[in-house]
Amino acid sequence: MAVPKRKTSPSKRGMRRSADALKAPTYVEDKDSGELRRPHHIDLKTGMYRGRSVLTPKNSG
């Protein structure tokens, strides 16, 4: 069984754990529709991605 040769310092332990925190998702305002969407994701209401129609838009209702 592997055993650490040295004790992990509190600083190193904290640096390792710094990536574990949950972060709020970021949103950007769409240039065309003004709706909020995730960056680098398809706008599901319009079906557009980077100015191109990728999906058929969802019908509201």
UniProtKB/Swiss-Prot annotation:
Entries under Gene3D superfamilies matching the protein: Single helix bin (1.20.5.640)
Chain intervals with Basic residues compositional bias: 1-16
Keywords carried by this UniProt record: Ribonucleoprotein, Ribosomal protein
Renumbered residue ranges of the record's region Disordered: 1-61
GO MF annotations in UniProt: structural constituent of ribosome
Protein name according to UniProt: Large ribosomal subunit protein bL32
HAMAP family the UniProt entry points to: Ribosomal_bL32
SS bonds (residue pairs): none
GO cellular component: large ribosomal subunit
Biased composition (Basic and acidic residues): 28-44
A Pfam family of this chain: Ribosomal_L32p
